């Protein structure tokens, strides 16, 4: 390689060398040979050449060596500092972020001027370390250097403030901007979506000029609604997006399919699947995974299996999604067979896969198999069980009536049990009439979620099942005394791509009178046939 460079001019030689590194090798020995050649030929006197080399080193995963090269450069300019800061900002390591801040401060110490490319990289560091005070310092420096009118820099500042909890600062910056392009609008929309401020996001979308809105604008709001558990509103905004003839992209469709899955909206979900097929987007693994998830959660596990078998490419998420779907539908044997098939295919299960397969064992009652799988997580796959895995084990043992063993598992956990763990034990105590454990589980639940009526009702029912009517009555009176109300039941139905939700005792539905008329007619017809 060195001989080949000698035949070229020095600058073109380095370009060829960097390109060759990307193609032929990225080991440290090759990089050091390159660096030696740069020093011998004097190429290292040009900061542009050194920046290219640092970029090649960081892309090859040798950032420590890249930083060493940077620190030995006698007169690094702004471009070289930017290259080093950018490389460090891409790493998800606290040490790298502190080094990036040091590099930025060296830029100031050398009296070199930061430019519009410096600040977005440094703001990413502020986001990574969640340091709003450092971010505010950068904001002040942006103003000092006159870059507060740069859309590129302001967008970075808005993203930083949202990520660090400074919502008011982000909105103030936005409102004070005289010229706003679509990227600034979208940065604010994405920020509101990220923190769940969906009313603000919706208001901003309505305020946004229609000629500025693009598919990213709509997607920010749709995705925000979907992640905030407001699936109906996500679908409503998606339908408006289509009415305005804005083409959804892959990210949009992922969010909408997620909303359909949460609502169980099979009719609309199938329409979106047809759209995906028609647009030739069904080769995207992430979309196929979302389609499988939508069918499984909407009750059509057969269709979910059909899609799974038809896809050309599967990753761990694909396998986990179908295993979880089978488990949820009570097909424990099929879920286990799918898990074994996944392992034979050479796909390594992850922590979510084990939640799905342990859930399948729980539904079927395979206690011994569940224990073996749980133990294999650490011994075979190097996965440390988290609280959800322990929750699956408590559920598995509780359903099987092994309540004392479940209690021992809770005591052995490396972290404190949460409400889901104690709730599972309380439910199992109710089924298997274990009053002692039931009372202890409720006492823990009252500390964690004192207003959850379901917990009190479970213990009240346990007292009733054991014929202890006074304690059952006392439990219900206790609920009234502390103001805990029984959660109203609810149901839903999908009609013409719209999901209607009904809540027990709710009088706010716009067609409540007509609903009660129909119910009375149905009641009369039922009574006439009895």
Swiss-Prot record:
PPR repeats mapped onto the chain: 77-114, 115-149, 150-180, 181-211, 214-248, 249-283, 284-314, 315-349, 350-380, 386-420
Alphabetized Gene3D superfamilies for the sequence: Tetratricopeptide repeat domain
Region (Type E motif): 421-496
Keywords: Repeat
Pfam families cross-referenced by the UniProt entry: E_motif (PF20431), PPR (PF01535), PPR_2 (PF13041)
Keyword flag Repeat: yes
Region of interest (Type E(+) motif), ranges: 497-527
Molecular function via GO: RNA binding
BP-aspect Gene Ontology terms: RNA modification
Family: Belongs to the PPR family. PCMP-E subfamily.
Name of the protein in question: Pentatricopeptide repeat-containing protein At5g56310
Organism (species): Arabidopsis thaliana
Gene coding for it: PCMP-E13
């Amino acid at each position: 390689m060195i001989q080949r460079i000698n035949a070229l001019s020095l600058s073109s030689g380095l370009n060829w060398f960097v390109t060759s590194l990307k193609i032929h090798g990225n080991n440290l020995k090759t990089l050091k040979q390159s660096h030696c050649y740069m020093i011998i030929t004097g190429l290292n006197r040009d900061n542009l050449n050194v920046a290219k080399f640092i970029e090649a080193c960081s892309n090859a995963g040798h950032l420590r060596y890249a930083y060493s090269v940077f620190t030995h450069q006698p007169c690094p300019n702004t471009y070289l500092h930017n290259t080093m800061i950018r490389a460090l900002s891409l790493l998800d390591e606290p040490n790298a972020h502190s080094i990036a801040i040091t590099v930025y401060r060296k830029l100031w110490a050398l009296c070199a001027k930061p430019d519009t490319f410096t600040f977005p990289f440094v703001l990413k560091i502020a986001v990574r370390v969640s340091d709003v005070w450092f971010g505010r310092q950068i904001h002040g420096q942006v103003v000092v250097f006159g870059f507060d009118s740069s859309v590129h820099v302001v967008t970075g500042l808005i993203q930083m403030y949202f990520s660090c909890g400074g919502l008011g600062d982000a909105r103030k910056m936005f409102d004070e901007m005289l010229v706003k392009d679509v990227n600034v609008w979208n940065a604010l929309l994405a920020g509101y979506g990220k923190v769940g401020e969906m009313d603000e996001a919706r208001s901003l979308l309505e305020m946004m000029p229609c000629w500025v809105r693009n598919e990213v604008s709509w997607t920010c709001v749709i995705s925000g609604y979907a992640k905030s558990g407001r699936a109906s509103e996500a679908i409503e905004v998606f339908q408006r997006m289509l009415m305005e003839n804005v083409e959804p992209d892959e990210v949009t469709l992922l969010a909408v399919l997620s909303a359909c899955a949460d609502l169980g909206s099979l009719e609309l979900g199938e329409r979106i699947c047809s759209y995906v097929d028609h647009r030739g987007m069904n080769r995207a693994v992430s979309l196929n995974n979302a389609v499988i998830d939508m069918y499984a959660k909407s009750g059509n596990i057969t269709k979910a299996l059909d899609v799974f078998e038809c896809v050309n490419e599967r990753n761990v998420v694909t396998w986990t999604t179908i295993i979880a779907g089978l488990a949820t539908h009570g097909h424990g044997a099929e879920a286990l067979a799918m898990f074994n098939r996944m392992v034979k295919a050479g796909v390594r299960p992850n922590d979510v896969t084990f939640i799905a397969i342990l859930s399948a064992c729980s539904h079927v009652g395979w206690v011994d198999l569940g224990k073996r799988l749980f133990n294999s997580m650490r011994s075979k796959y190097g996965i440390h069980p988290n609280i959800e895995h322990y929750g699956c084990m408590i559920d598995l043992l509780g359903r099987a009536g092994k309540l004392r063993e479940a209690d021992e598992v809770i005591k052995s956990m490396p972290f404190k049990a949460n409400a889901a763990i104690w709730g599972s034990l309380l439910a199992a105590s109710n089924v298997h009439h274990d009053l002692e454990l039931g009372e202890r589980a409720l006492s823990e639940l009252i500390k964690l979620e004192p207003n959850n009526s379901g917990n009190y009702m479970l213990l009240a029912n346990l007292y009733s099942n054991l014929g202890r009517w006074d304690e059952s009555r006392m439990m219900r009176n206790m609920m009234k005394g502390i103001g805990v109300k029984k959660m109203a039941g609810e149901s839903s139905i999908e009609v013409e791509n719209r999901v209607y939700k009904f809540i027990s005792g709710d009088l706010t539905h716009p067609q409540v009178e007509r609903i009660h008329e129909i119910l009375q007619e149905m009641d009369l017809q039922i009574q006439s046939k009895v």
